[in-house]
């Protein structure tokens, strides 16, 4: 969408992960300081082979996440994690609250907005509480990285690094009920006996436990928005900025509601 901007260029804050020159700038292979992007990139300068295959990435062993947490001791997966980490974390949410909310946390603030972690934040998901990609309450405990078996414990261990497709043929060597990527949703370890989403089913795949928890979270958000914030809310994963005012308070996204002018504003 930067084609329509003036000037038409990939901005500094986006160039690292949306262009080869931007990523090389971040790595410092262009002679600039490593760790930051100094210049916008040209439209059309997409990610090419040299972005991930160069002298800097060959020796990269650590990655710093938006929370400030640094994960070290990495291998080839480090080059993936530099971009598949999101752009926000617990830290950014807490900073926004501290800056824009008074002592009464339930008071709507016109200075608040939805903080989007950004897209495909797989590395933040993988490392859990170690990097705090999702919001963490200070008095709660959260899971860290799940240690898989040797050889399948990194991004590139389970995914083709170029197509991003899961290596299903490798998965089914141990997960014998897996024939296709859709079957991955049915995986559940024998020791997982907790009914996380409270639906009474402890045999469903962990994917479905998480999906159930997501439904419960959405219901809680909608209840809070209607009862405390005073403005009903709906969510549409396919339309920016994703959260919208539920104008008829029916709990569903209806025609005309998922539009930017109707973005939710009672945070």
What residue ranges belong to the model's regions?
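Structured mid-domain segments that build the active-site/substrate or prosthetic-cofactor binding neighborhood
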Residues: 150-189
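Acidic, glycine-anchored loop motifs typical of Ca2+
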Residues: 182-262
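Generic recognition of stable, solvent-exposed alpha-helical segments in well-folded globular domains
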Residues: 9-12, 75-78, 150-153, 166-169, ...
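Sequence context of c-type cytochrome heme-c attachment sites
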Residues: 1-78, 82-160
């Amino acid at each position: 969408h930067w084609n329509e901007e003036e000037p038409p260029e990939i901005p500094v804050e986006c160039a690292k992960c949306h262009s080869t020159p931007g990523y090389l700038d971040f790595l410092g292979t262009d002679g600039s300081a490593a760790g930051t992007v100094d210049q916008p990139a040209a439209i059309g300068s997409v990610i090419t082979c040299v972005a991930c295959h160069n002298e800097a990435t060959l020796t990269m062993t650590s990655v710093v996440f938006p929370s400030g947490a640094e994960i070290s001791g990495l291998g080839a997966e480090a080059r993936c994690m530099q971009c598949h980490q999101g752009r926000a974390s617990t830290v950014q949410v807490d900073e926004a609250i501290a800056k824009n909310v008074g002592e009464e946390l339930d008071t709507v603030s016109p200075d608040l907005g939805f903080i989007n972690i950004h897209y495909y934040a797989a590395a933040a998901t993988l490392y859990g509480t170690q990097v705090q990609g999702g919001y963490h309450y200070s008095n709660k405990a959260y899971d860290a990285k799940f240690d898989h078996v040797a050889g399948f414990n990194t991004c590139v261990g389970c995914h083709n690094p170029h197509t991003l497709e899961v290596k299903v043929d490798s998965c089914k060597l141990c997960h014998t009920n897996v024939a296709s990527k859709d079957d991955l949703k049915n995986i559940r370890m024998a020791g997982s006996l907790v009914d996380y989403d409270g639906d009474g089913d402890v045999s469903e795949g962990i994917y479905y436990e998480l999906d159930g928890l997501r439904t419960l979270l959405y219901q809680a958000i909608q209840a809070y928005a209607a009862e405390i914030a005073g403005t009903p809310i709906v969510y549409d994963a396919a339309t920016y900025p994703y959260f919208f005012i539920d104008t008829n308070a029916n709990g569903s996204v209806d025609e005309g509601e998922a539009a930017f002018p109707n973005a939710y504003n009672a945070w």
